[in-house]
Structure formats: C-alpha cells, structure tokens
C-alpha cells in the first residue's frame, strides 16, 4: 500500500504547514481595526484551512501501515520536543509539565492525538475498501459526508461538536483519501481542477466575508475543518499536485521537518512575540507580508532547532 512520494506531494506538505502557521499568526492579531485586513484574514482562512484536510487526505491516499515501534518512536520524539518547549518558555507549573509528558493522551496537540488513534484504527479501516464494492464504498462516504460535513456546514446541527477537529472527521477524510487512491488514480484536467478549487475558495470567502460584515465579527463556519467546501477544495488541491512530477532533494528533506514545525510552533511563537508586536500594524496594508515573513521565520527556526538537537520526528509516511 505504501508508495514512494515524489517532491510534488512533499511540496504540498510544506505549503500546508506554512498555511497552518499563517492561520495561527492571523488568529493572534485583532484585524477588526481594518476592513481590508479583516478581508485578508477571511481569505487566509478560506485558502489555508485546507492544510489539515490535505495532510489527512495524503495519509489516506498513500495508506498508513501500522507499525507500533515507529509509533512509539514518534511519541517519544513528540514528548521530547513538548517538554523542551514547555521548559523553554518557562511554563513550569505541575499541570503543564504533566500534560507535556503525555501530549498524545492529554490532547496537547489535537491533530497528533487524533492521528495516533487513527493509526491504531487503520488495520481495520484499510479493509473497508477491500471488503466493500466501489458502489457501497461511495454510499458509505456519502453518508459520512452528509452527517459530518454537509449538515454542519449549513448550520443545521453538528453531531460531534468539535468543528471537524476530532477523530471522526479524520477517519472520514482518511477513507476519502483511500477512495481517491483506488478509484481516481487517472490523470485529470488541470483546468477543471483549478476551476473547482477557485469556486470552492470563492464561495467560502464570499459567504464568510458577508457574514463577518453583517455580524460585525469574524465568521468562520464555511472555512471550518468540517466544511464541505474545505473538503472539496482539498480534494482539488491533492489532485492538482498529483499532476506534477518532479524531484527535489531539498524539498524532500525540508518536508521531513513538517511535524517538528507543527510541534514547535507554539514555543517558537512565544519567543518571537517577545520582540515582535503585530498590534501597531493591525491596520496596515502590509500586515499580510509581515505575517508571511513571520510564518517563514517560524518554519526556519523550528527546522534549525531540530537540526541542532540531531533529532528528527518521523513523518507520517513512516508510520
């Protein structure tokens, strides 16, 4: 089930973590003081919140082979960097130290916790497309998407009450990735894929932007993790990057630090925010460029920290 990943997918992973950092950066800035920057904030969420879904789609597309030893190694590396980050920022409270010692169980990072539990389920999840016919597999995905994406997107009710940041959503997207790998492995028209992506982002932006304007505060329902438009856009992104075919040792090596960047994000931001204050620039037209530089700085510092410790976090392709 495992396949060698060329640099097109590794580049996608780098862009995904960059997008997540951009959202985290804008999330800490009060953009309400500027209509322009509020719109930029909505646009950032509309585009980059596809990052998490793309990560899970990639896991499903290539399939996870459960390996308990590698999972333990992953856990130990995450514990090391979490404890390092907790101590480095001076958070020496008993509760914080205990949580940092058990980051997976304590849901210190929701994505990593859910990913761990997903790994334990994959020996069974991987049998679903093997046991079900294509028609029944499509029916299963349709029901899952209806219950846990379509209905929550349009605000009727949300069964899981987690905004898509939970195990049920991750299982659903993983299975969708398996479906794409098995039944959509042919070449697609890139023009149509771009159109689908553009329409998805456009609807999310217009809907959330309009509601933000009417309600007077940032509205994020249509760009949430469980949004059907985010899921559709993420599928378009995955299929677009699959059409690329190139190899870069630099990109492949850099992509190996993606998980470390995610884990160290909070720690690096805590240090940087001691010297960087975005508040004076919240109304400036160049705020987005400052945010881009800030996100890139976090990625570089996190990667250098990993290199300095001579430790590497195994990527999800290794589990």
PLM segments and residue spans:
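Alpha-helical membrane-inserting segments
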Residues: 84, 88, 121, 125, ...
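Alpha-helical transmembrane segments and terminal signal-anchor/GPI-anchor hydrophobic tails
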Residues: 156, 160, 167-170, 187-252, ...
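Aromatic-anchored segments of alpha-helical transmembrane domains
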Residues: 18-25, 81-88, 143-156, 198-210, ...
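Solvent-exposed interhelical
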Residues: 67-70, 120-144, 179-196
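Specific transmembrane alpha-helix
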Residues: 49-65, 111-126, 154-187, 226-246, ...
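Transmembrane alpha-helical segments and their boundary/interface "anchor" motifs
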Residues: 16, 42-56, 63-119, 192, ...
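N-terminal membrane topogenic signal
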Residues: 2-15
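Conserved small/polar residues in nucleotide/adenosyl-binding loops
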Residues: 309-315
